[in-house]
Amino acid sequence: MVTGKFLREQWAAGNAALGLWAAVPSAFAAELMAIDGVSYVCVDQQHGVIDYADLVEMTRAIEGRGVVPITRVPANAAWLIGRALDAGAQGVVVPLINTAADAAAAVAACRYPPAGVRSFGPIRAAL
């Protein structure tokens, strides 16, 4: 299985990562976007019309094709970031980061204590 670590390794090696953005709520469309040669598909919950149930199904479809599922959450809120990660997103794009404090809050929302504030509820990981 390809994981978010794959993207970090690609970027660390100076390689580009080709990604696509999904803004409509369709697991089938997300699976079609996860074609060979694509490194990630980002499910856009900020400007797309995708709810939590759609996110779960879309991340499963993307991951099933061996592509990294990430999501752009609607806002820099710890509960939204944690919920996206619990749904199966292997990375998050957090909008409206304007200060160092905003960035620190977003990072803390991705990490479990003591390094962060993310609560434990890995719904997808428990399956």
Which residues does each PLM region occupy?
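Active-site beta-loop-alpha junctions enriched in small/polar residues
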Residues: A23-P25, Q46-G48, P74-N76, I97, ...
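Glycine-rich, proline-tolerant flexible connector loops at the mouths of alpha/beta enzymes
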Residues: A29-E57
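Conserved anion-binding
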Residues: W79, G91-L127
